[in-house]
Design a protein with these regions (language model features):
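Signature of N-terminal electron-transfer/Fe-S-associated modules in redox systems
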Residues: 1-156
């Protein structure tokens, strides 16, 4: 089957197998920030934006993305780098394997709710597994990022 989608701002048309996961499609196109973790939608490593909403690309068929926009961390370089610096500053990146999925979900949270409470942050990121147990540092990094963004916008 043939699909056409916009990946990180670039329109792509490809012939794909009907059972191809979106995860495999984006990785085949060089988007290696999207990780294969559990293949069961339990770890958050494969998070991408489908029309600006976070989805787990291991459980989404590429056919579902036909005609839509898909964004990976490669398409959010400036924003992801800004946010990633706050995670690193808190020592929460350790091995870094979980960072892309966690960053994608944290950015989605910030876009949906620019002033989340600590409980809202924890709830939103509950599906992101970190094998190094950096959760507290990640939480502090997110809170610091939000405070910085508000200051950038002149709200503090």
């Amino acid at each position: 089957m043939e699909v056409t989608l916009t990946l990180n701002g670039k329109r792509i048309t490809r012939s794909v197998d009907a059972d191809m996961a979106l995860l495999d499609f984006v990785r085949n196109d060089g988007c290696y920030s999207v990780k294969r973790g559990c293949d069961t939608s339990n770890c958050g490593l494969c998070t991408v934006f489908l029309d600006d909403k976070p989805v787990l690309s291991c459980s989404v068929l590429v056919a579902r993305a036909d005609g839509h926009r898909v964004t990976t961390m490669e398409g959010l370089q400036k924003e992801a780098a800004e946010f990633g610096a706050f995670i690193a500053d808190q020592g929460a990146e350790q091995c870094g394997f979980c960072n892309p999925g966690m960053i994608m979900n944290a950015l989605a949270l910030f876009r949906e709710n620019p002033e989340p409470s600590e409980d809202e942050i924890k709830e939103y990121l509950a599906g992101n597994l970190c094998r190094c147990s950096g959760y507290e540092g990640q939480l502090r990094g997110i809170q610091n990022f939000i405070a910085w963004k508000k200051a950038q916008q002149g709200e503090v």
